[in-house]
Each structure stands twice: as structure tokens, then as C-alpha cells.
Amino acid sequence: NNIGYVEGAGDVVPESLRQIGYNVTIIKPEQISPENLTNFDAIVVGIRAYNIVDELKFKQKFLLDYVKEGGNLVIQYNTNRRLKVDNLAPYNLKLSRDRVTDENALVTILQPNHPILSFPNKITTQDFEGWVQERGLYFPNEWAEEFTPLLATNDKGESSKQGALLVAKYGKGNYIYTGLSFFREFPAGVSGAYRLFANLLSSGKENLTELKN
């Protein structure tokens, strides 16, 4: 499993993924090209990359084309102010200040049979036990109908937030946007967070496995 990682504000996600057996390559912004991206099974974008990496405004087209051609793009949280790109996603996606600060907040699985929640790991509410600090932050609160929200969660007294994990088919690939705080859960060794992230990285591969079998 070759994973390309575009760094943002700095997080331990690349090292965490290496520890569980992924081959992770850091991709510098200037290395984002159609040729280079084809080497990877999935591309992950680090936290707040779209707030701080100027070059992404020129490279976003290549990342979205990578998805269109069958790639798997996983974007972690960005703040809703001062984005470097107008087209964060291939479809309308609007970030908000929505967050869930209670790390034990109930998580409802909206699409239990969705491939991302089924392969290779069957994700259940148990995978959201033992999280630290928060569930996530800066969730999108508006999105195009092409997106499927997979989870709902909220702090006490707040409305249900369904923007924590959104997936959209684009061309032959999958675009995934998540405000879940994987960057906090990995250092704490939260197994459910690892299991879910493994599914994000495998998105689109479930059919290949069926063909092999």
C-alpha cells in the first residue's frame, strides 16, 4: 500500500501510518504532478494544508484529476477561513466552525453498509470508544448531493452534525473529506481511529479484492 502524504501544519499521521505497515512518501507541493501521483494507492492531505500551503492553489487541479482517473484522495481538516483554493472539492463543499469537543459524544453510523465502513474493517460505534480530546473540528455544513455523509455526532445541546466524514465518487475515484481528529487519536493509540483510517485508504479497492477472490 503506497500512500502519498501532502503535509500541512505538521502532524504525526505519516509516522503513525508507517507504524502499522503503510509505505508513506511525503510529497512536497512542487512534486504534485500527474506522473508522480499515479504511483500512489491513496493520497492523504495533512491538517490545514489548504490554509497554509500556497502552492496548492496551482496543484489542486492535479489532485482532483488524480481522483477522476481512479485515485483515492483523503483530506483532513482545514479551517473555514483563508482557504488557498476556491475548489476544495470537485463539488460544492462549504466548511463551517462546526465541531464536536466531547471526545465521548455519541456517534451514529448513518450508512452502516457503505464500503468505507465495511472494508477491510467493519466499523461500529465501538470504534469510537476511547477517543481523546475531541471528535473533530471544522466540519463542512453544506455539501452537494454527490456527497454521502457517513456519520452523525454532536455535543450535548447541539444539533446533529453530519459533516464529520463525507465521501463522493468523482470520475473513477473517491474524494473523502474528514474533520475527524485522527491526528490526535493516532498518537494516543486509539485502535478504532486506525481501523477507520485504514478503510479510508482502501476506499475503491473493495471490488478489486472481490475480483481476486
Give the location of each predicted region.
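Short amphipathic C-terminal alpha-helix that caps PH/PH-like domains
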Residues: 192-204
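Extracytoplasmic/secreted envelope proteins and their assembly/folding machinery
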Residues: 10, 14, 37, 60, ...
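Catalytic beta-strand/loop cores that center a nucleophilic Ser/Cys/Thr
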Residues: 99-190, 208-211
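Extracellular/periplasmic catalytic domains that process cell-envelope and extracellular macromolecules
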Residues: 36-38, 67-68, 159, 169-171
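A glycine-rich, often tryptophan-bearing local segment used as a flexible ligand/cofactor-contacting loop or short
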Residues: 48-129
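Alpha-helical scaffolding within the catalytic cores
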Residues: 29-32, 57-61, 159-165
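Aromatic-Pro/Gly-enriched surface loop or interdomain linker
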Residues: 1-46, 77-79, 94, 99-102, ...
